[in-house]
Structure formats: C-alpha cells, structure tokens
Amino acid sequence: MSDKPLTKTDYLMRLRRCQTIDTLERVIEKNKYELSDNELAVFYSAADHRLAELTMNKLYDKIPSSVWKFIR
C-alpha cells in the first residue's frame, strides 16, 4: 500500500460496502480514533455522502442539495 492519503472517492467506495446505517456508524466510530485530522475531514465527507445514499436508497455521484434535508 502506498503512503498517498485516500481521497473522498476512495473512502466512499470502501463505505459503499456498508449496507445499513448501523454498520456505517460503527465504521465511523472506529475510524474516528485511527485517522489523522486531515484524513478524518475527508473521511467524514465521504461518510456523510454514504449516509445520504443509504437514507435515500440510491447511489449518487454528487448529492443533490434537496436530499440533505432528509439526513439527520
């Protein structure tokens, strides 16, 4: 594995393995303590994206702004 930090897309592809919000929350909790601050910001962005996908039961390249009102 390279030393290059993962991008939002890299994290999103990994998070798409999570099929439920509960599983996603467990992965978020685990990574909260393992990632640096910079990596965590990128990871949280991808996690929010995946949460929107799970909530709407659809995959998105870019989350429409109208979807965010349904996310807790």
Swiss-Prot record:
Sorted alphabetically, the keyword list is: Transcription, Transcription regulation
Against Gene3D superfamilies, the record matches this protein to: HHA
User: Phenotype of the disruptant?
Assistant: Derepression of genes that are usually coregulated by H-NS and Hha.
InterPro entries in alphabetical order: Hemolysn_expr_modulating_HHA, HHA_sf
Q: What is the effect of changing residue 17 to A?
A: Still interacts with H-NS, derepresses expression of H-NS/Hha coregulated genes but not genes regulated solely by H-NS
Q: Which SUPFAM superfamilies match?
A: Hemolysin expression modulating protein HHA
Q: Which residues form a coiled coil?
A: none
The protein's job, in short, is:
Interacts with H-NS and in this complex might contact DNA, which could provide an additional surface for DNA binding to the H-NS-Hha complex; may not bind DNA in the absence of H-NS. In vitro improves the ability of H-NS to bind DNA under a precise set of conditions.
Self-association or partners: how does it assemble? Answer: Interacts with H-NS; crystal structures suggest each subunit of an H-NS dimer could bind 1 Hha monomer.
Q: Which family does it belong to?
A: Belongs to the Hha/YmoA/Cnu family.
Task: Report the NCBIfam families cross-referenced here.
Answer: PRK10945.1
Q: What is this protein called?
A: Hemolysin expression-modulating protein Hha
Give the organism the record lists: Salmonella typhimurium (strain LT2 / SGSC1412 / ATCC 700720)
